[in-house]
From Swiss-Prot:
Gene: RD3L
Name this protein carries in UniProt: Protein RD3-like
Keywords, comma-separated and alphabetical: Coiled coil
Stretches assigned to coiled coil: 28-57
Comp. bias (Basic and acidic residues): 157-166
Transmembrane portions of the chain: none
Provenance organism: Homo sapiens (Human)
Stretches for region Disordered: 133-168
Amino acid sequence: MPLFGWMKWPKNDSYKPTHYPGSDIVTKTLLRELKWHLKERERLIQEIENEQKVKKTGVDYNWLRNYQNPHTTIPVTEQRQLEVLCSQVQPCQTGTILSRFREVLAENDVLPWEIVYIFKQVLKDFLSSSDRGSEQEDLEDSGSMDCSAPSVIQGDSSKRADKDEIPTISSYVDKNTKDRFPVFSHRIWNLPYYHPSS
């Protein structure tokens, strides 16, 4: 008889609170995108390093290598936090989050180990802004549960009419990332990518 046979261990998926139908698909989609960006950024850095080695030595030995460099992986605790955040996203909001994430990556020279932090910040910013939007909808007693755009409050329309600029996703990202990512936008030099020994 096993020593701990009487204990009921939690199932693997017990840490994921599913808030919306289809949130498993959303979680898989968002995490697949994050892992793809990690691999692509790592591959790009590896290519740049190889080009610099070829320029320095004058000889290309890349065809001799048959081993794979260690890939940047997401720690398990970080992965679970991301899964919990992703499960709070409605399926119709996935495209908005992905476009914001891609835009932040395109505007900043980001290293592979910074990508997970940026993705988490984009998720948190989106969820906090959608929470504020849902509070406004609750005040107006709009009981719809679908993914419609948040309605405009009457007092806000006069403020928006004065603006010459049409609000876009990029302006939202610019406003919200100025104070959060000062290191990424003000980087002056690029250090070589470091592969930690295992």
